[in-house]
Amino acid sequence: MSSNTAAPQFLTTPEGLSLHYTDHPATGEEQGTLVFIHGSGPGASGWSNFKHNIAAFQMADYRCVVYDQWGYGKTDKPTHIDHTLDFFVDGLGALLDGLALQSVTLVGNSLGGAVALGMALRQPERVKQLILMAPGGIESREDYFAMEGIQTMVKYPMGSPEFTRDVLAKLLTLLVYDEDSIDEELIEERWTTLQTQNSHVLATMAIPDLSDQIGHIAQPMLIFWGTEDKFCPASGVWKMLKGGGQVQAEILNQCGHWVMTEHPELFNTRSLAFLSTSASH
């Protein structure tokens, strides 16, 4: 499923900010709700991150809510607020409140993984399970900025003349193991979205190292990580496995930062098996 047929919807937070999401109903009798939380980067959005996955979960009778985080996609891009983990978790909380969702499964990639962990730590009663792909918030800022992908992402400010389409194309190839999988359609999709972004989100982003708090998360957790990840060190998976709790992991070679895009069938199948067998919190 590569085209988004769900109507764009918006909710307004108590602070007056607008948050964009799409709501994809279960095909049959609903088994639960999954909220998909995308990662960071130029041109990122919820649908761009998860367009290869939503249909499989709908067909398995899960309601899927896909939203754009602050500073991304069609959601507001405030320049007067620092983009801390708390601010991103506030956004997720506003979404859950606005849709009257009491307890959901969180599916998060990269920054989205850190936000999912942040919500599980802040309001554990609202999180049933977690499915995370190379989550952020597991290393120090210095460790992340030593990664080739992060260095490339922050070299030129978003919206600056130096951040050209070719720079974006190069960055996208770093997200995956197979560079040939980055086609013109994806580059154009991200480039179009990038035109609406500003540099404030990356300039003020502050995500703490949560690795020493993993043991406080009781919910079942499934983690995917590619060994060729150039953005989040694959060694982070061992921190999470050793951190305690109910943690399972799928480690893939010949895979970069985008497991759900590079290996969608494996990701979808393994995630659905996890959802059906893991105990609810």
Regions found by a protein language model. Give the residues of each.
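Alpha/beta-hydrolase fold catalytic core
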Residues: 1-37, 45, 59-62, 173, ...
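Active-site loop/oxyanion-hole signature of alpha/beta-hydrolase fold enzymes
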Residues: 22, 51-55, 59, 66-107, ...
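The serine-hydrolase catalytic nucleophile loop
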Residues: 41-54
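Gly/Ala-rich beta-loop-alpha elbow adjacent to hydrolase catalytic centers
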Residues: 108, 112, 116
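Flexible "cap/lid" loop of the alpha/beta hydrolase fold
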Residues: 117, 121, 128-160
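Conserved alpha/beta-hydrolase catalytic His-Asp/Glu region
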Residues: 146, 161-219
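Conserved loop-alpha-helix segment in the C-terminal half of the alpha/beta-hydrolase fold
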Residues: 216, 220-255
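Catalytic active-site module of serine/aspartate enzymes centered on a nucleophile-bearing elbow/loop
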Residues: 246-281
